[in-house]
């Protein structure tokens, strides 16, 4: 009885730890709206090299993000995808606010190769260019801080396919 209960408690703690890690990956810096944070993470590739481009994101999050995808398109083009038919989000089946791009776009996927928890400026990334479809989650804009020309805006890059 005791070993079974102990094992169950360990499994529960591991599950809660994984949920905490997963939840922390979707936290935006307070100075951004969700749409602004989407644009920063997935549209505004500040350098053609992942290592340099990821420094911007890592500095806001104060950690080395494991991976990130930059869509080589405009924010306006992604906003247009928000007008495509709604679908269930692949990463969260309870969300129905996702939209398929309908056409492939060039993108760069950055993958952390050299973590550096003590100094995030030393994190290094490999990059993989590709042409792929993507699925994006969209929500109504933040009335106070997002530009009024887009009533519905992208807030999460759910999947690349």
Swiss-Prot record:
The active site is at residues 42, 156. Substrate binds at residues 65-69. One of its GO terms (molecular function) is RNA nuclease activity. Residues 1-27 form the signal peptide. InterPro entries: RNaseA (IPR001427), RNaseA-like_dom_sf (IPR036816), RNaseA_AS (IPR023411), RNaseA_domain (IPR023412). Pfam families: RnaseA. Glycans are attached at residues 34, 44, 86, 92, 111, 119. Its EC number is 4.6.1.18. Keywords: Disulfide bond, Endonuclease, Glycoprotein, Hydrolase, Lyase, Lysosome, Nitration, Nuclease, Signal. Belongs to the pancreatic ribonuclease family. Interacts with and forms a tight 1:1 complex with RNH1. Dimerization of two such complexes may occur. PANTHER family: NON-SECRETORY RIBONUCLEASE, RIBONUCLEASE. This is a non-secretory ribonuclease. It is a pyrimidine specific nuclease with a slight preference for U. Cytotoxin and helminthotoxin. Possesses a wide variety of biological activities. This is Non-secretory ribonuclease. It comes from Gorilla gorilla gorilla. The lineage of its organism: Eukaryota, Metazoa, Chordata, Craniata, Vertebrata. The gene is RNASE2.
């Amino acid at each position: 009885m005791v070993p079974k209960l102990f094992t169950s408690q360990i499994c529960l703690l591991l599950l809660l730890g994984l949920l905490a890690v997963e939840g922390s990956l979707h936290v935006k810096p307070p100075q951004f709206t969700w749409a602004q944070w989407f644009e920063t993470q997935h549209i505004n590739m500040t350098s053609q090299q992942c290592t340099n481009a990821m420094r911007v994101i890592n500095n806001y999050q104060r950690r080395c993000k494991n991976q990130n995808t930059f869509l080589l398109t405009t924010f306006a083009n992604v906003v247009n995808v928000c007008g495509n038919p709604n679908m269930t989000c692949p990463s969260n089946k309870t969300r129905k606010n996702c939209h398929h791009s309908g056409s492939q776009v060039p993108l760069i996927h950055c993958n952390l190769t050299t973590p550096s928890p003590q100094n995030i400026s030393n994190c290094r990334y490999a990059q993989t260019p590709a042409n792929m479809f993507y699925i994006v989650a969209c929500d109504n804009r933040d009335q106070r801080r997002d530009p009024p020309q887009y009533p519905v805006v992208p807030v999460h890059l759910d999947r690349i396919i």
